[in-house]
Amino acid sequence: MPDTPSPRDRLIVALDMATTDEAERLIDRLGDAASFYKIGYRLGYAGGLALAERLVKGGAKVFLDLKLHDIGNTVEEGVQSLARLGAHLLTVHAYPQTMRAAVRGRDSVPGSALRLLAVTVLTSYDDADAREAGYALSVSELVAIRALAAREIGIDGIVCAATEAAQVREIVGPDGLIVTPGIRPAGSDTGDQKRVVTPAAAIRAGVDYIVVGRPITAAADPRAVAQSIVAEIAAA
């Protein structure tokens, strides 16, 4: 990866709650055990962008998992706005027109540090889901096709399951970012994720950043869980 973040910075905590009050309470409980936060649809549409701006101003990093996908002009202008917000990572769906528009939008903001991530195949999908959606390809084949397109268009990294990380690394090279959701510490409930691995296994597979939600946010002691995951990353 182009930078070398600390083990703590490689953990992205998913703020998948309903209100910014809940999110800020969790952030306070985590303290310095975490420094990177993901904001998705649920919180994003409930004041999450304002929270993102506050977090950035406070020195934290923010991953906006908004999975943009629309006509080119709409995506381009949306990315411009989000780049000005100061977010560190932003997801877009891995469709060529969408990705090209996102790159144009990001590159039009002077000094932007925003990195764009292409969502290849959701980690809640498996081969049966791909067939149901009308694809005559396996998940791994779809991931490879979309990762190659993303690299050629100039996207900075890929969101994929850790099970596809080695395959994606061959495509994006050493400088491409790989971000993996669906991470579950050993013994955790997998929830609605189907292609899950532990933090250590993800790091060993070549993942740059891992995204962890419920195992931290639903824990009785989220700080202790976050610290345990960071230690696992450091030891991997």
UniProtKB/Swiss-Prot annotation:
Keywords annotated in UniProt: Decarboxylase, Lyase, Pyrimidine biosynthesis
UniProt catalytic activity: orotidine 5'-phosphate + H(+) = UMP + CO2
Listed pathway(s): Pyrimidine metabolism; UMP biosynthesis via de novo pathway; UMP from orotate: step 2/2
Annotated SUPFAM superfamilies: Ribulose-phoshate binding barrel
InterPro entries, alphabetized: Aldolase_TIM (IPR013785), OMPdecase (IPR014732), OMPdecase_AS (IPR018089), OMPdecase_bac (IPR047596), OMPdeCOase_dom (IPR001754), RibuloseP-bd_barrel (IPR011060)
Record-stated family: Belongs to the OMP decarboxylase family. Type 1 subfamily.
Subunit structure: Homodimer.
The protein's role, per its UniProt record: Catalyzes the decarboxylation of orotidine 5'-monophosphate (OMP) to uridine 5'-monophosphate (UMP).
Protein name stated in the entry: Orotidine 5'-phosphate decarboxylase
